Amino acid sequence: QYGNALFDALLSEGQEFNAVPYGTEALGVMRIEKGHVAGNEINGQTTAQNLGLSRMISKKADSIGNILSEREGFNRSDIATLSGFKPVQRNQKLEAGSHLISAGKKPTMENDEGWLSSVAFSPTLGHYIALGFIKRGETRIGEKVCAVNLLQNKTTEVEIVSPHFIDPEGDKQRG
């Protein structure tokens, strides 16, 4: 009953701060641009190590995720880590769920090195961007791999980049 009045009041009060309304789709794009993880990245299979957050797990005191972080399988050097991806040909669309295969290799399970978890068109950058996981991602920045979508019979060459597409230092965020 009071929703419209509240909305109008918030817009009115926010005018001096250049506040504008935006929807959840815009929020989703902004979180990908900023490299923030959400449901597609934290799906029950990911650990702090996958997300590049292992230094936040206390080695001295008990903490959530501490026991899991000590398991041998999660401490391998080839673990898939959160990375950013952008198409080499900027006009190409990316597809969430695409598998990541090194250039020149066949798209087989043995050659699968990761996947694109979240994709959006970035109006700020003017092209598609993606978050995803790829083996040793943090050491492969600048490398080009293939994003393969077998359901649509589509292969797109992508570059591995930082998952922080916009304002990586947080200057805009902090003002």
Functional labels for PLM-detected ranges:
Residues 1-175:
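Conserved, structured C-terminal
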